[in-house]
């Protein structure tokens, strides 16, 4: 009896335990499904951590398990054939959900980490802290682990296929039927429908082909006739230059010029030469009228020099562009064939170093081909820049330059030298539609950029230009191209030139052209004086502007033009003045102080006065291109240099050391953040001589005496300062001269001491100013007495 009671008690306790456990699980399931209170939200977050957006499946499973425990009063089975099928189908759903989540993570810049598990963990904690409103967790951590393993083994495509296989396997285990039993009828019906559709479509296509065959033949005949008519019309009325400009630069070589114009090139030159002698005779009379008219003007305005007021010569004709040679067309077919091959090499080379990127665009330039590379999300630009040598090795290139990034684009430019360099001529640059539409007389042609577009430099907007590069890099050709561009567009009364050529061989060919203010200055000592005269001219112009109430040369010339329309006496307008220094380094060696001061003053103030400078040097060191010069000349052109240090001296950035030479340049205009790579326009000596002969035949040069540097005469007047003789004796005795020394010894002010030093320099006692070094004493003790007279 006691044993029976004990068994009933144990059975009752077991039933009570199952019911209590079932009720507890039921409470958890209901609270989680309804998200009741803080406990419900916590359970939901816990379920989402494991199953992601499929968290409701776990709540439903707990609900079913609770009911099973309370009804059956036994533990629910955790594994069976059907339950295993449900497991596989759930795993397939979790894996598929995480495939979509991984695509979102790749497109989100905020998650650059490639680990799916870490990204899922971060998303879960962002959701926990409330920083993200119900973020998508995909398949939760279970899905993340499954996807990480599947993606590592099978990639994205294999993962999707694995999802399908898991789902089908789970469906088979759940239903207990094979695939044929489940989908056999549907597959057979689909197969029969596809067969019927293909047969019907085939019959309709055969009928359509039969009916349209005759119509197609008729259309071909009509199209052939139209093409023949268009070809005949084009041969009669076609404009070769316009056809060339309409051709896309990406497909056709930019350097190809119309061959029909080359036939007329020699004829044009023969017609131009006889006209030179006639023009030379007809220009003498207007020159006399100029002098007479200039003598009658200037009564209402302050006195203006001949250099600043020139009466226009109505008979002057600008040189025609036909005087320049047509370019020879290089064969770039090999470069075009290598474009796709090199683009694929770039992609594979970057991929071999773990850099995912693709080439989106290619620019075939005259000397360089530029590949635009778009890196994938998460790839640092510095990784591609650091692979410059490896990319050059893969492409078998001499050297490559990387522009990272390209301004205005989300791409990196990789510039690879061409095997065949296409020569860009000045004629094709100045014959472009952009040049014809530009009416600015100071807009000079530089060459073509990598995409084949012509590049122009408006000198009046720069307002000054610094050109630097090693010997043989194309610097002198660039200077000749700038001067020739001005001669082709500007008349002598519009632009005046002052040329300084210490080498005495580069610019002497321009002696005699009417645009010159003075003959080409070849002596370095006279060059310093010439720059001082330009500074004086600038001051005269500003004095003229102040009396006339204008602010710049454009406003003054407009005022003169309006007055000439109302009055009979014609007043001349002011021309622009372009100062060209071919070798700045030689001038800085002879008289660095005076030259730097003059250049600094012109660079700071000469823009409004219409005075612009072009400084060229082949030694881009800091003692030549000083900080004062760089600060006031923002526009620079850098040709090939030997080191990155020289490149930084010119452009404040590297890149010029990787240029190819032969006109390859980096052009940095004022306001630009990065330099533009340009293939400079080539101009032969024969073309320069032809242009100069034409210009000289049109009008003779009229040099301005007040702008011509003269020999410095020795000062003989006595110095009006009682300390001068004592100062000379002190300087000779100490064999050193400085303003501070005179201030200390004689206890005088800076102005008086500086005046004494200037008087000694004017009389040849001490040398010129040399920066921080003391001045050199040029006389001996026995010359002391004579120096004071």
Curated annotation (Swiss-Prot):
One of its GO terms (cellular component) is plasma membrane. Residues 452-648 form the FtsK domain. GO terms for molecular function: ATP binding; ATP hydrolysis activity; DNA binding. The chain crosses the membrane at residues 20-40, 49-69, 83-103, 152-172. Keywords: ATP-binding, Cell cycle, Cell division, Cell membrane, Chromosome partition, DNA-binding, Membrane, Nucleotide-binding, Transmembrane, Transmembrane helix. Residues 173-789 are cytoplasmic. This is DNA translocase FtsK. It comes from Halalkalibacterium halodurans (strain ATCC BAA-125 / DSM 18197 / FERM 7344 / JCM 9153 / C-125). The gene is ftsK.
